[in-house]
Amino acid sequence: MLVIFLGILGLLANQVLGLPTQAGGHLRSTDNPPQEELGYWCTYMESCKFCWACAHGICKNKVNMSMPLIIENSYLTSCEVSRWYNQCTYSEGNGHYHVMDCSDPVPHNRPHRLLMKIYEKEDL
């Protein structure tokens, strides 16, 4: 009975968070998550390269339009994300992992914001 309840709760959490339920709600490790999930992944780890569109060294956030334009630098991280049941994981590719409960997410942006270089017109 408890297993059925937890399963239903997991499906409801996926619907509330906008995470699709394909393949049992699992997402294999990828550096290119589905477009419809970018809003979720890029909210909690905004320094992932897949969250930004870059051209000529200037980058714009694909999800959060209030983010400033930035200069492409070490702030952007090659991330891989995965989801197994209700555990969401970000891998930064350098042995650092951020693991969180998908239905109770915790942002992991602060350590990376220290490296962000905001684009100024004078930078051209």
UniProtKB/Swiss-Prot annotation:
Residues 1-18 form the signal peptide. It comes from the Viruses. A motif (Prevents secretion from ER) lies at residues 121-124. The keyword Plastid does not apply. GO terms for cellular component: host cell endoplasmic reticulum-Golgi intermediate compartment; virion component. Glycans are attached at residue 64. Pfam families: v110. The keyword Glycoprotein applies. Induction: Expressed in the early phase of the viral replicative cycle. Its main location: virion. It is found in: Virion; Host endoplasmic reticulum-Golgi intermediate compartment. InterPro entries: ASFV_fam_110 (IPR004848). Keywords: Early protein, Glycoprotein, Signal, Virion. Causes the redistribution of lumenal ER protein to an enlarged ERGIC compartment. Belongs to the asfivirus MGF 110 family. This is Protein MGF 110-4L-B.
